């Protein structure tokens, strides 16, 4: 009898100069050496924290790079933590100049195609962005996915806000045009940074995705808006396949810690998973340096005290503000 497997995965797609899109949080295009080095470094705190609290899960790192192209410290880490590296081509790539930013994001659907062939009944898959830290075991998350089929992160419900070039009412127009019916309830935006799915739901997504994507390519020829990124697609597929929920909201929060916008509140430090997009070249870099060659958490209380100070969760200290500024300047001239 097959014992169900919980897969925890993240990914990095290295863009070429010809296809490079803009990464707003890093202020660089995806082909830059800075972007590459930062994304390699943040794999360390990601895998160390997720593995520490979920030792029985199977871990995979997806990339278009060959393993020999990874930095030595990452190869050593993956060997120690038993992280599998899967080199996967990008076949779901959008057309050139599709949207100015984040054109690597449709790699998610290549991962789903790969995992569909690999997973068995009742296996579950978590695809997480690498700028996340795990604080607790995720057994209850996987149990919920095994029961309900999915755990999605509902991030935006504002019907006026333009979400990377499209509003929720406009997404509903695309949905109605594609499927010939209105959504059963108002469309909401599900973030692509934390998506957990059961094997059979992955199969359904892989069947439904080509139709929606082909429709999207034709739709933009006659309309001023389109589904620009992977989460737009996911949000419509969730409605179409009746897998909508906000289960993942109990586990993760996208925590903005910029000088201009901060949505972190006291108590947010208790989330099982911290998503810290602004901290890629700041707090997560400091954690990469802290972990070093140890590749493990030896003192949980000490580690999370430092992690909170480094990432500004739940409070940003004056010391962090100064250190962040100096680190940013140093990286500019690195």
Enumerate the language-model features and the residues they cover.
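Catalytic core and acceptor-binding pocket of nucleotide-sugar-dependent glycosyltransferases
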Residues: 178-281
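Short acidic donor-binding/metal-coordinating loop in glycosyltransferase active sites
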Residues: 130-132
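Short, surface-exposed amphipathic charged segments that create phosphate/polyanion-binding patches used
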Residues: 97-107, 166-170, 263-267
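A conserved donor-nucleotide-binding helix/loop in the catalytic core
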Residues: 37-46, 93-126, 136, 140
């Amino acid at each position: 009898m097959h014992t169900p497997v919980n897969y925890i995965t993240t990914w990095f797609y290295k863009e070429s100069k010809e296809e490079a899109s803009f990464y707003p949080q890093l202020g660089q295009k995806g082909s830059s050496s800075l972007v590459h080095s930062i994304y390699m470094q943040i794999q360390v705190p990601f895998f160390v924290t997720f593995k520490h609290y979920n030792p029985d899960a199977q871990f995979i790192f997806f990339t278009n790079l060959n393993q020999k192209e990874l930095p030595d410290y990452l190869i050593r880490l993956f060997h120690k933590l038993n992280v599998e590296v899967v080199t996967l081509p990008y076949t779901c790539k959008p057309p050139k100049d599709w949207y100015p930013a984040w054109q690597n994001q449709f790699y998610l659907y290549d991962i789903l195609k790969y995992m569909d062939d690999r997973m068995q009944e009742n296996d579950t898959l978590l695809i997480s962005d690498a700028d996340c830290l795990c604080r607790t075991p995720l057994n209850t998350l996987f149990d919920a996915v095994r029961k309900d089929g999915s755990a999605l992160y509902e991030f935006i419900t504002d019907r006026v806000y333009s979400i990377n070039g499209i509003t929720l009412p406009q997404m509903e127009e695309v949905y109605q045009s594609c499927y010939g019916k209105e959504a059963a309830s108002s469309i909401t935006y599900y973030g692509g940074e934390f998506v957990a799915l059961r094997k059979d739901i992955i199969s359904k997504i892989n069947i439904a995705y080509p139709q929606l994507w082909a429709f999207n390519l034709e739709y933009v020829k006659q309309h001023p808006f389109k589904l620009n990124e992977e989460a737009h697609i996911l949000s419509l597929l969730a409605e179409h396949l009746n897998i909508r929920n906000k289960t993942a909201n109990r586990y993760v929060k996208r925590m903005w810690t910029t000088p201009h916008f901060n949505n972190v509140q006291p108590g947010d430090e208790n989330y099982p998973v911290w998503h810290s997009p602004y901290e890629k070249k700041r707090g997560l870099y400091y954690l990469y340096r802290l972990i070093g060659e140890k590749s493990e958490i030896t003192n949980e209380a000490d580690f999370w005290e430092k992690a909170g100070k480094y990432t500004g969760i739940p409070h940003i200290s004056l010391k962090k503000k100064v250190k962040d500024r100096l680190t940013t300047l140093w990286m500019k001239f690195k």
